[in-house]
């Protein structure tokens, strides 16, 4: 107690001995620092709003002339299919790359029917197999085309949220092989031509799972975090060549991967989401602190801003809340599986 009293007396004496002028200077400095912090945060938010709702992105035509090609991986369903359709509408020829040949043929016919002036090519390859022969075929196709746009959409997630210790090895391997290695290998085949032509656009589908550590989707979350770092690094490397690289940060979208069918303010359908991506190229949207990245869909952008600029993404509270949400999803998925199993047994 005497120790505390002694030091409080010293503090009191220091305060009393501090000259009034210095007190004013100190208070002014604190006020200025606080005001600067508040103003900077406000300006960031204004920038986010302008990026999401007002300012246009780069025109797609700036990446290549009419009749140049767009390569879309994971093209047969969902986002990939919608990217292909909207790029075809913008007069790009389309190289469709995905696993199922019949789905690719169906989409190819749909594109040429809707847009008669657009050419299509298809390549059926399973990115999970990581076969050199498939990438050799892709290289042969790419080398003979003027590829202006690459959409790295191919991806895989867990069948349901699962603790890492219980994740099947084949599922874990497929996620890393498809999301990471497949994206890298496809990009490495396309980029040299873009560098030679001094133009191009490389879009890679990211995820909030790459921003937020996601318990029970640990491997998927890690793969998307890898893509975030890789794409940002690639963006800096290719910018001097006139190539725009952008990782698209997305929350939930109605798709086969998300297993969500109903849209809402925070869960758009593929058409709305892809439109926001293609009309906001070069704008960060809700991700002002991430170079060469964007959260272009308005509600996703506001969520990304709040997470990255207000709450932070790596804190224990945020991670715990994310864990709780996915534990709940897992419980519902397991109950649904049990009900379906019961129906089959009867």
UniProtKB/Swiss-Prot annotation:
Membrane-traversing stretches: 26-46
Keyword NADP set for record: yes
Catalytic reaction equation(s): a very-long-chain (3R)-3-hydroxyacyl-CoA + NADP(+) = a very-long-chain 3-oxoacyl-CoA + NADPH + H(+)
Catalytic residues of the enzyme: 220 (proton donor), 224 (lowers pka of active site tyr)
Subcellular location: Endoplasmic reticulum membrane
Function: Component of the microsomal membrane bound fatty acid elongation system, which produces the 26-carbon very long-chain fatty acids (VLCFA) from palmitate. Catalyzes the reduction of the 3-ketoacyl-CoA intermediate that is formed in each cycle of fatty acid elongation. VLCFAs serve as precursors for ceramide and sphingolipids.
Record protein name field: Very-long-chain 3-oxoacyl-CoA reductase
Phylogenetic classification of the source organism: Eukaryota, Fungi, Dikarya, Ascomycota, Pezizomycotina
